[in-house]
């Protein structure tokens, strides 16, 4: 049975960090999340919760679909 999983558009965030010469720690501080949380979300180890999604959308001034997408995972496997 497929399950929706919210994923971040990792390439967008990484390119933003390169373009603005930001470290992961600097960006996390700017967004208002812990560096560990940002790292786990970017690496797919953690799904972003509502608070993280809200903070990131506010910081980047983007719509949900511009920064995140739904991935469908088969739970039966």
From Swiss-Prot:
PROSITE patterns: HTH_CROC1 (PS50943). Residues 13-67 form the HTH cro/C1-type domain. GO terms for molecular function: DNA binding. Its main location: cytoplasm. It holds the Pfam family HTH_3. GO terms for cellular component: cytoplasm. Residues 24-43 bind DNA. It is found in: Cytoplasm. Keywords: Cytoplasm, DNA-binding, Transcription, Transcription regulation. This is Uncharacterized HTH-type transcriptional regulator YvzC. It comes from Bacillus subtilis (strain 168). The lineage of its organism: Bacteria, Bacillati, Bacillota, Bacilli, Bacillales.
């Amino acid at each position: 049975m497929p399950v929706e999983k919210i994923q971040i558009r990792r390439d967008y965030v990484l390119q933003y960090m390169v373009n603005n010469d930001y470290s992961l720690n600097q960006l996390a501080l700017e967004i208002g999340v812990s560096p560990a949380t940002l790292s786990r979300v970017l690496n797919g180890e953690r799904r972003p919760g509502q608070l993280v999604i809200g903070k990131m959308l506010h910081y980047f001034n983007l719509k949900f679909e511009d920064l995140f997408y739904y991935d469908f995972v088969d739970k039966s496997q």
